[in-house]
């Protein structure tokens, strides 16, 4: 039995030696393994120990010395490092969206057994003296090895290049895990915090901090949204707080202004400089966070580089409270981070030595403490409180600080002078506040052109009332309000003046009007007894609208219709007098444009047929006009005598045998055109109905006048008459004179038409060939 046991032990030792030789074969390639067949002696204890150690082996020889795991949660703004700590540097680049721009710089790995660890992808940035950066990207290593980062290059709209690093993790089973930056549901339990540490040379190192640490952390705001951080060489970090929870709408403060008995609400923006005294209001260039208690908000941007950190004291007896929140201006070497939910400020100086300033702020204060807010707090920052909202709204930028003034009720502003105050920070920086004086001169300017309604109604011919508007150009001060006329209608005031003859004259100051009508209503003229003369300045292209007063003005370019059917038309032949409604007669003398136009109002008799309503057919009625007289053509003793209707316009004196012809003639004087062409896209207006019928035939192409000799048809009767005379001249021979007018040759139309006409005189001479007479034509105006 003993010999058999010894043989078994020898075989086991030989087998172990064989395995040990195979294991050490990669280390010693020149050596051959030993077998137990060549040895008869017993193995020594040292050989057994070496075989046992070689059998066990080292499990981590062929693997990397360490594996780096980085957990990134961009939606929460967190980075957590596991296993070996690794430095992460923020590259000089511009942020895009909610992604963190991270670059991993791995330390050199140790080399054992001729196995080199592949380096991870890295990206670096070299900063020059002028602050410009030139990012470079290097990538090496086997893609299947762990501890690798995926670098994504993003092109910005501004032209710069961004690099986004996404780590690829490997599980125990060897599966690759790639983190999705948009989803954070699986990483909610691994919430870490970020700490900014100054490393000198305008660089900031982003490392993982303890979860229980409370200083120098960049926390979330009240809305649980990401806080974008951007690091630039030589420039401070701008921190912008996100929108606060709640649906407060931003309302611009309106300032009530009384203009002519009408209260207007003009949107204004108040701008108070740091030095006090005078301020100029304009459109702000920076935005502010909404969320005030009432929505009334005044935005003020200081013009100095350092804004005073002060607080407007509240007045319990006043209905208006102004609260100002200000801070210091960050220099190029200061870094400021804010935590809105904890109310803490942390300032880190970017120098070789790390300096941390923590300034906790009291979240709430009583009303008595707000009244005595001139005293400094222990932390060096004063409280800015509101009676209805204790939440402080701060926006910190790397430029002049934006001040925010909250007004509870826009009734009266009470601004008190603040004595000079100073406070000292822990880092040794001293800020001196500037004494503010009460506002003395405030210049207001409307943000947008404001339409101001002035109670000056104008009645249109259709019966509608239109309101004239005046645009406020500038407002210098509340006591001195200047309103510039925008070329709209002006109101004229008539003042009675006693003349040498004992009559009362109503004079109107000359007013230069460009393209706008002047309105004269009955109320202005009725207050003046025995009104006879009204002087109106040069009108240019404007007209005069008369309410209840019959006035017709000549030497006025264009046409204008009054409220009582009175028309204004340019007339260059003679002065015109019109009687409408039996109120008065108006005589207007045609003068040069630089002179005044005299309007003479005379008492007259009522005329029933002076007004003509468009669209109605006129019927023949007995004329009761006092200007009409009995006819003298057949003698006064004849029973069948005719009345003659005389035009009462001064300087005209035309006589007509029919009242319809006189009415048509008066419409020509007043400029009325009641007959409108209803053809598609035409709409021309005419004074007489026969003119409308003649015009309508131009659309239809109707030729109703036919020559009895040659059956040639014409559109107008005067063309037919001219054609008939050519036949008569051919038959008669010799020299004949043909006079053809531009209107129709019937007697009724000739009597109605009182305007000048162009007359064609054709002299026809007979030559040797009677078939081809010579015709010489000349044009004369009568």
From Swiss-Prot:
One of its GO terms (cellular component) is nucleus. A motif (9aaTAD) lies at residues 465-473. SMART domains: ZnF_C2H2 (SM00355). The modification Phosphoserine is found at residue 44. Residues 120-146, 281-342, 364-378 have a biased composition (Low complexity). A zinc finger (C2H2-type) spans 645-669, 675-699, 705-727. InterPro entries: Sp4-like, Znf_C2H2_sf, Znf_C2H2_type. CDD domains: SP4_N. The keyword Zinc applies. Residues 1-48, 107-148, 275-385 are annotated as: Disordered. GO terms for biological process: regulation of heart contraction. Residues 107-119, 344-354 have a biased composition (Polar residues). GO terms for molecular function: DNA binding; zinc ion binding. Keywords: Activator, DNA-binding, Metal-binding, Nucleus, Phosphoprotein, Repeat, Transcription, Transcription regulation, Zinc, Zinc-finger. The keyword Repeat applies. Expressed in many tissues. Binds to GT and GC boxes promoters elements. Probable transcriptional activator. Required for normal male reproductive behavior. The 9aaTAD motif is a transactivation domain present in a large number of yeast and animal transcription factors. In SP4, the motif is inactive. Belongs to the Sp1 C2H2-type zinc-finger protein family. This is Transcription factor Sp4. The lineage of its organism: Eukaryota, Metazoa, Chordata, Craniata, Vertebrata. The gene is Sp4.
């Amino acid at each position: 039995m003993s010999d058999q046991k010894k043989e078994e032990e020898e075989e086991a030792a030989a087998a172990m030696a064989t395995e040990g030789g195979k294991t050490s074969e990669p280390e010693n390639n020149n050596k051959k393994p030993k077998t137990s067949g060549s040895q008869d002696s017993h193995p020594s204890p040292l050989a057994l120990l070496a075989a046992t150690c070689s059998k066990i082996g080292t499990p981590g020889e062929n693997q990397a010395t360490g594996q780096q795991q980085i957990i990134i949660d961009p939606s929460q703004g967190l980075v957590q490092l596991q296993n070996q700590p690794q430095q992460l540097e923020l590259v000089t680049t511009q942020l895009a969206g909610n992604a963190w721009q991270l670059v991993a710089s791995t330390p050199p790995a140790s080399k054992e057994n001729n196995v080199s660890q592949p380096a991870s992808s890295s990206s670096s940035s070299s900063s020059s003296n002028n602050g410009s950066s030139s990012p470079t990207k290097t990538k090496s290593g086997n893609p299947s090895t762990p501890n690798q980062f995926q670098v994504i290059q993003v092109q910005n709209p501004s032209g710069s290049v961004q690099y986004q690093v996404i780590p690829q993790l490997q599980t125990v089973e060897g599966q690759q895990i790639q983190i999705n930056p948009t989803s954070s549901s699986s990483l909610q339990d691994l919430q870490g915090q970020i700490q900014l540490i100054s490393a000198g040379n305008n660089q900031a190192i982003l490392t993982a901090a303890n979860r229980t640490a409370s200083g120098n952390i960049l926390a979330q705001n009240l809305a649980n949204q990401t806080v974008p951080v951007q690091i630039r060489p030589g420039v401070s970090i701008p921190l912008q707080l996100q929108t606060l929870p709640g649906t407060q709408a931003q309302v611009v403060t309106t300032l009530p202004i009384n203009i002519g008995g009408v209260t207007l609400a003009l949107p204004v923006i108040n701008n108070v400089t740091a030095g006090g005294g005078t301020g100029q209001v304009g459109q702000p260039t920076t935005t502010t966070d909404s969320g005030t208690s009432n929505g009334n908000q005044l935005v003020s941007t200081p013009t100095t580089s350092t804004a005073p950190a002060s607080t407007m004291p509240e007045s319990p007896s006043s209905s208006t409270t102004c609260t100002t929140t200000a801070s210091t201006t960050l220099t190029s070497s200061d870094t400021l981070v804010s935590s809105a939910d904890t109310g803490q400020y942390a300032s880190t100086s970017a120098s070789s030595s790390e300096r941390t300033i923590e300034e906790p702020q009291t979240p709430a204060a009583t009303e008595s403490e707000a009244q005595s807010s001139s005293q400094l707090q222990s932390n060096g920052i004063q409280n800015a409180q509101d009676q209805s909202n204790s939440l402080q709204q701060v926006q910190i930028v790397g430029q002049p600080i934006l001040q925010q003034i909250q007004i509870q009720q826009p009734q009266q502003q009470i601004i008190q002078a603040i004595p000079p105050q100073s406070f000292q920070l822990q880092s040794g920086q001293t800020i001196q506040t500037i004494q503010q004086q009460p506002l003395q001169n405030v210049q207001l300017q409307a943000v947008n052109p404001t339409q101001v309604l002035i109670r000056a109604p104008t009645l249109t011919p259709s019966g509608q009332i239109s309101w004239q508007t005046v645009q406020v150009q500038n407002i210098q001060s509340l006591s001195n309000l200047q309103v510039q006329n925008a070329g709209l209608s002006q109101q004229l005031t008539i003042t009675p003046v006693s003349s040498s003859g004992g009559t009362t004259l109503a004079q109107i100051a000359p007013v230069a009007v460009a393209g706008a009508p002047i309105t004269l209503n009955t109320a202005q003229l009725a207050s003046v007894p025995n009104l006879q003369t009204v002087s109106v300045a040069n009108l240019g292209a404007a007209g005069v609208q008369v309410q209840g007063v019959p006035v017709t003005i000549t030497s006025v370019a264009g046409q204008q219709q009054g409220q009582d059917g009175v028309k204004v038309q340019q007339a260059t032949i003679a002065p015109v007098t019109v009687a409408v409604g039996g109120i008065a007669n108006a005589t207007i003398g045609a003068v040069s444009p630089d002179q005044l136009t005299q309007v003479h109002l005379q008492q007259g008799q009522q005329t029933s047929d002076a007004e003509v309503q468009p669209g109605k057919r006129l019927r023949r009625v007995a004329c009761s006009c006092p200007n009409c007289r009995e006819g003298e053509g057949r003698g006064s003793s004849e029973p069948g005598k005719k009345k003659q209707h005389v035009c009462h316009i001064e300087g005209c004196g035309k006589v007509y045998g029919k009242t319809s012809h006189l009415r048509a003639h008066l419409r020509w004087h007043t400029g009325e055109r009641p007959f409108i062409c209803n053809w598609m896209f035409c709409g021309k207006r005419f004074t007489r109905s026969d003119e409308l019928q003649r015009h309508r035939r131009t659309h239809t192409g109707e030729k109703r006048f036919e020559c009895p000799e040659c059956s040639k048809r014409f559109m107008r009767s005067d063309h037919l008459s001219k054609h008939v005379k050519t036949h008569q001249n051919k038959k008669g021979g010799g020299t004949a004179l043909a006079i053809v007018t531009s209107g129709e040759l019937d007697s009724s139309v000739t009597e109605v038409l009182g305007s000048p006409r162009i007359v064609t005189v054709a002299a026809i001479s007979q030559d040797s060939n009677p078939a081809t007479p010579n015709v010489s034509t000349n044009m004369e105006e009568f």
